[in-house]
């Protein structure tokens, strides 16, 4: 991965450090020195894959690494690392396929049975509007 990232322009890639920086323990350390700002509504959204094959490259490769350190994950971030704020939403995959990190950010522009990413973000924005944001 480092060689591929270097060809893409990263002068000093460190793939493993990037992945381990998202472990639950690394997030806990970072959160301890990053307090919430007063008056800001914090919420988090997370999904997970059922198997490594449910994420496209490179998430299919990072899934087992994250699983080894922290368990249930979306191919990049562990569920326990993502919990933050007043509201936490866990997107539960329907059926055998999971919902990868790439799926949640609509990286692959895929239609996933039981999960419409565009409608999810519309409902998220509508909820923020209802809350007065």
Spans of features found by a protein language model:
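Helical cap/lid subdomain of alpha/beta-hydrolase-fold lipid enzymes
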Residues: 1-133
């Amino acid at each position: 991965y480092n060689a591929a990232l270097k060809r893409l322009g990263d002068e000093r890639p460190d793939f493993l450090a990037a992945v381990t920086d998202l472990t639950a323990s690394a997030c806990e350390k970072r959160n301890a020195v990053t307090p919430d700002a007063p008056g800001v509504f914090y919420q988090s959204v997370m999904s997970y894959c059922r198997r490594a094959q449910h994420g496209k490259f490179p998430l299919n490769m990072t899934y087992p690494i994250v699983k080894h350190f922290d368990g249930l994950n979306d191919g990049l971030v562990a569920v326990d690392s993502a919990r933050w704020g007043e509201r936490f939403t866990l997107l539960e995959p329907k059926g055998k396929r999971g919902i990868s990190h790439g799926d949640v950010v609509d990286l692959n522009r895929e239609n996933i049975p039981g999960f419409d990413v565009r409608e999810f973000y519309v409902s998220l924005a509508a909820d923020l509007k209802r809350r007065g944001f």
